[in-house]
Each structure stands twice: as C-alpha cells, then as structure tokens.
C-alpha cells in the first residue's frame, strides 16, 4: 500500500517512528470502525485507516506516553 495523502513526512513529524505510526493508525482505525466520534469535520479518505492517518497528520490523535497495555 502506498500512502499519498497525508504525506509520510508529515505523518512522521507527528510520531517518532514508522512502527509507532502504524500502531497508532491501526488502533485509531479500529476505534473509528467501532463507532468512536470522528476528530475532523471533513476527510479525503472514505476508509477508517485513511481517516485515522488524516487525524494523525492534523495533530488530533497522538500517542499517550503514559498509557500501558497488558500484553497477555
């Protein structure tokens, strides 16, 4: 999959690594699919992952460094 919008450079300016970006986008996309409120009024993408990436690029979704999840 090739990301054309938002640009990967803009996305990586919001997070510290590609891994963090992929995890954040996947988690936010899952929330969107589960019915969470959207953070933007308008989206260019019609898919949850694209919407999540647009929210990250806009600075509406960030990583909470204090949040820890149980692995198993």
Swiss-Prot record:
Report the function annotation for this chain: Promotes RNA polymerase assembly. Latches the N- and C-terminal regions of the beta' subunit thereby facilitating its interaction with the beta and alpha subunits.
Give the keywords, sorted: DNA-directed RNA polymerase, Nucleotidyltransferase, Transcription, Transferase
Q: Which Gene3D superfamilies does the record match to this protein?
A: 3.90.940.10
Is Aminoacyl-tRNA synthetase there in the keyword field?
A: no
Subunit composition and interactions: The RNAP catalytic core consists of 2 alpha, 1 beta, 1 beta' and 1 omega subunit. When a sigma factor is associated with the core the holoenzyme is formed, which can initiate transcription.
SUPFAM superfamilies, per database record:
RPB6/omega subunit-like
The organism of origin for this protein:
Lactobacillus johnsonii (strain CNCM I-12250 / La1 / NCC 533)
Q: Name one GO molecular function term.
A: DNA-directed RNA polymerase activity
In the record, the note on similarity to other proteins reads: Belongs to the RNA polymerase subunit omega family.
Q: Which superkingdom, per the lineage?
A: Bacteria
Show the HAMAP family listed in the entry: RNApol_bact_RpoZ (MF_00366)
Cellular-component GO terms for this entry: DNA-directed RNA polymerase complex
Q: Which reaction(s) does the protein catalyse, per the Swiss-Prot or TrEMBL entry?
A: RNA(n) + a ribonucleoside 5'-triphosphate = RNA(n+1) + diphosphate
- The name under which this protein is listed is DNA-directed RNA polymerase subunit omega
Q: Name one GO biological process term.
A: DNA-templated transcription
Known EC number = 2.7.7.6
């Amino acid at each position: 999959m090739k990301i054309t919008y938002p640009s990967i450079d803009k996305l990586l300016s919001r997070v510290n690594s590609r891994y963090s970006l992929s995890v954040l986008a996947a988690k936010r996309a899952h929330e969107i699919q589960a019915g969470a409120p959207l953070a933007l009024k308008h989206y260019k993408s019609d898919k949850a992952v694209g919407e999540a990436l647009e929210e990250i690029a806009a600075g509406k979704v960030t990583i909470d460094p204090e949040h820890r999840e149980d692995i198993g």
